[in-house]
């Protein structure tokens, strides 16, 4: 878009990228230029996205339905390539717009906090229209139906986006409590040790939705569904960033990503299964009924559920 970047992941034919290397993304490149000089040089974290930039889109199986990812605060559009790229590899074109008002790239700049929740929804829907009119992708994308996946503040964007008839379902990950604008199927995910959003409030949101699945993942926290979490866990936290970013931002970035937390890679593997299954069901891509159950977690070693469609046993303090 003219005033902010949009990222799009889409299916490609394996032969079209044969011999090429997938894109490597370093999260330090999205940190605000105001802060970048204060960041130690060894704190960059390279992530193999598994995606190939500017590859020709697959055409044989299209048109492909759509999902959108709305990042948290502060966050960035490439924060969850473990999920966005995975969806694209399973036939779902996935869009992510940079919400400049809550972007890591605008932290401590005049743009920070400038956008309203309604602005964020407008940006997301404008990005959908942009992809639909794109010369390369327009012929292979189905923009008539979309699932919106929101993390933290992005869950509010997802919930409000249900006012648009094209949004057929939402996945809300550690989401700020926000009622849906219109009733839609929902996957509602809480993280047991979330220090920012009380799982009990997420449970209450789940109860307010007619068709909703509630998943509470054990031993992890708020930042589990971002690419950087396993890297943060590997290095033992983000202590070196406290002076540059402030203690509150660092605590939020570490939440669920410290060595004592559940293995972040296992958590993300489990999220891929639940989210992809839900997206397939909401978009009508399944030939039969989807059976997302507590036993689904048994498919991934090293991670457990604290509850499935069950109230958190001991409510945490206010986040």
Residue spans for each PLM region:
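Gly/Ala-rich beta-loop-alpha elbow adjacent to hydrolase catalytic centers
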Residues: 149-154, 158
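Short substrate-entry loop that stabilizes the transition state in hydrolases
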Residues: 47-64, 69-106, 195-198
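Domain-level recognition of soluble alpha/beta enzyme cores
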Residues: 1-66, 252-262
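Short beta-strand/loop motif that positions the catalytic acidic residue
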Residues: 188-190, 194
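Alpha/beta-hydrolase-fold serine-hydrolase catalytic core, especially in secreted/extracellular enzymes
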Residues: 228-229, 233-319
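Conserved alpha/beta-hydrolase "acid-adjacent" motif
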Residues: 195-201, 224-225
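Alpha/beta-hydrolase active-site loop
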Residues: 79-82, 89, 112-143, 160-162
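A conserved short beta-strand
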Residues: 97, 165-176, 184-185
């Amino acid at each position: 878009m003219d005033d902010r970047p949009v990222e799009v992941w889409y299916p490609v034919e394996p032969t079209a990228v044969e011999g090429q290397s997938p894109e490597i993304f370093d999260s330090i490149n999205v940190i605000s230029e105001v802060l970048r000089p204060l960041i130690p040089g060894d704190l960059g974290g390279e992530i193999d996205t598994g995606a190939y930039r500017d590859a020709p889109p697959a055409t044989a199986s299209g048109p492909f339905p759509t999902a959108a990812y709305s990042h948290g605060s502060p966050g960035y559009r490439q924060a969850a390539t473990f999920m966005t790229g995975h969806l694209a590899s399973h036939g779902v074109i996935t869009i992510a717009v940079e919400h400049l008002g809550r972007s890591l790239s605008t932290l401590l700049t005049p743009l920070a906090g400038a956008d309203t929740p309604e602005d964020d929804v407008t940006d997301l829907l404008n990005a959908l229209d942009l992809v639909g009119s794109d010369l390369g992708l327009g012929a292979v994308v189905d923009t008539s139906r979309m699932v919106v996946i929101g993390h933290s503040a992005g869950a509010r964007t997802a919930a409000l986006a249900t006012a648009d008839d094209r949004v057929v379902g939402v996945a809300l990950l550690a989401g700020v409590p926000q009622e849906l604008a219109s009733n839609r199927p929902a996957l509602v995910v809480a993280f047991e040790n979330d220090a920012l959003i009380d799982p009990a409030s997420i449970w209450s949101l789940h109860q307010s939705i007619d068709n909703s699945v509630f998943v509470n993942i054990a031993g992890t926290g708020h930042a589990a569904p971002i690419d950087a979490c396993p890297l943060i866990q590997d290095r033992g936290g983000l202590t070196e960033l406290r002076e540059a970013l402030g203690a509150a931002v660092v605590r939020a970035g570490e939440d669920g990503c410290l060595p004592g937390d559940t293995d972040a890679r296992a958590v993300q593997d489990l999220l891929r299964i639940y989210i992809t299954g839900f997206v397939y069901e909401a978009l009508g891509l399944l030939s039969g009924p989807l059976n997302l159950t507590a036993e689904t977690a048994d498919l991934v070693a090293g991670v457990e559920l604290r509850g499935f469609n069950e109230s958190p046993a001991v409510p945490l303090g206010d986040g």
